Amino acid sequence: AGDDRREMLARLPTELKPGELDTLFAATRAVHVGPRLLDYVQALLAHSREGAGFAVGLSPRAGLGLLASARAWALMAGRDHVLPEDVQAVLPAVAGHRLRAADETPLPPERLVCRLIEAVALP
């Protein structure tokens, strides 16, 4: 009960062996993102910045994070390519905290993300 936190951390089992994380990063980078999917991500970013419902939109850097996360999601699903559904699945975690409603209504991030997904057509 009174264990030192460092001792507790030292007793945690290792989940990854040396080099496995690098292998996972490389595998994630190898997941294919097609041109239509890139257009979809760009449309999401553009709508968040230019659409009537948002005061603060998503930056190009947010788009890069969205693509990296969607690649990882696809890899975890056992695929070598990203689907629009992968982008939609990770969008709340990647972008929810970055979006602000234009009318300053304090909407939950999940609702703002839903608005964005509903406003942009799937490829």
Identify the function of each model-found stretch.
Residues 1-43:
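Conserved AAA+ ATPase core "coupling" helix
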Residues 48-123:
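C-terminal engagement/docking regions of AAA+ P-loop ATPases
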